[in-house]
Amino acid sequence: MRSKYIVIEGLEGAGKTTARNVVVETLEQLGIRDMVFTREPGGTQLAEKLRSLVLDIKSVGDEVITDKAEVLMFYAARVQLVETVIKPALANGTWVIGDRHDLSTQAYQGGGRGIDQHMLATLRDAVLGDFRPDLTLYLDVTPEVGLKRARARGELDRIEQESFDFFNRTRARYLELAAQDKSIHTIDATQPLEAVMDAIRTTVTNWVKELDA
């Protein structure tokens, strides 16, 4: 079985870190042990600097980051990560487990920010070509639940401080995109933790078994 790229998506407070741990545990039980982990934005020295610029509310002082500048910084970080980390890992037979990928931009910037979705799709295709995750787990929570969890973790970053309306639009776009793409599996992350973990285990196990079929 060739290596695969699995991405975990969701609003702030959806439980992506816990989900990643469950994915890793499940893959190991299935005999898959050669894995690397990525996060977006970030994952390389350059991409981490871009992450700081786009997420740290104090990174550019009083200067307002425009919506299109934000998108371009996300894509600069993403293509650097894909070309220097993700693709080489996959080529070497290593599975890649990612905390966010392009679906975040389509949902947050296309839904939350209201940036033209055709422009985003064109930009994605120009930068990434036909490169896509093999499996995406979208952890669905309401903004009320997710932001309550995020606030309990401590200080919020620039995007986490957006309004409930922003996150409602983002969630709606996530759900819309998930309904259009069979590689995106939606997990109800408002359930009790054990139920969420069981749903992730079942989804990943069944998906891997289908690869072997």
From Swiss-Prot:
Positions annotated to bind ATP: 10-17
Keywords from the UniProt entry: ATP-binding, Kinase, Nucleotide biosynthesis, Nucleotide-binding, Transferase
Enzyme Commission code(s) on record: 2.7.4.9
Signal sequence coordinates: none
Reactions this protein catalyses: dTMP + ATP = dTDP + ADP
PROSITE patterns: THYMIDYLATE_KINASE (PS01331)
Main function: Phosphorylation of dTMP to form dTDP in both de novo and salvage pathways of dTTP synthesis.
Family per record: Belongs to the thymidylate kinase family.
HAMAP family to which the protein is assigned, alphabetical: Thymidylate_kinase
Record-given protein name: Thymidylate kinase
Lineage: Bacteria, Pseudomonadati, Pseudomonadota, Gammaproteobacteria, Enterobacterales
Gene name for this UniProt entry: tmk
